[in-house]
Regions:
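Signature for the C-terminal beta-barrel architecture of outer-membrane proteins
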Residues: 2-177
Length: 177
């Protein structure tokens, strides 16, 4: 587990995480995590649905102050990973619930997300053999869209590295985090 290390001041998780290592299963790691966080958002006056999320962090005007911390997200998830020598495999799942319904025409339209719940399941791998490193990740969102990033790193005589990467993100894949 690592602490938050991004430059974004608003899209972090606020909560806790626990890593469990059992002696009998020392090649496996089990992680659970939980987050409660508030986001700045504007809501439709009639329906109360979230119309837009704001990540600028400004709270200067009356409107900006009204948006401050107006939507809560509760997220819970887990991860299991297996690591043995130069092989690593993992699976992750998280589920998120917002305190308000997010309207389809909100700022998350890019991700085709609406409603008050989101989830994502993923699997990843990292395999190192001699001068090659195969790595990748697959993720399935609540829209049942499957996205992936896969690649191989080739090292030539320790003087040059070449990376080939393939990325596939369908239009209906909804990566909220």
């Amino acid at each position: 587990l690592k602490g938050y290390g991004s430059v974004s001041e608003v899209q972090f998780f606020r909560g806790g995480a626990l890593r469990i290592n059992l002696n009998e299963l020392r090649d496996f790691n089990f992680n659970i995590f939980y987050s409660d966080n508030y986001y700045d958002a504007s809501s439709n006056i009639l329906s109360g649905d979230v119309q837009s999320f704001y990540t600028d962090g400004y709270h200067r005007t009356t409107t900006e102050i009204q948006r401050k911390n107006s939507v809560k997200e509760r997220l819970i998830g887990g991860r299991i990973s297996y690591e043995k020598g130069s092989y690593r495999f993992g699976a992750t799942y998280w589920q998120s619930k917002f305190s308000k319904n997010v309207a389809r025409d909100s700022s998350l339209i890019l991700h085709k997300f609406s409603g008050d719940r989101a989830n994502l399941a993923g699997a990843d791998y990292d395999i190192i053999t001699k001068n090659m490193n195969f790595f990748g990740e697959f993720a399935l969102s609540q829209t049942s869209a499957l996205a992936s990033v896969n690649g191989v790193l080739l090292t030539f005589l320790e003087i040059a590295d070449v990376i080939f990467s393939y990325r596939n993100y369908p239009a209906d894949f909804t990566p909220l985090h």
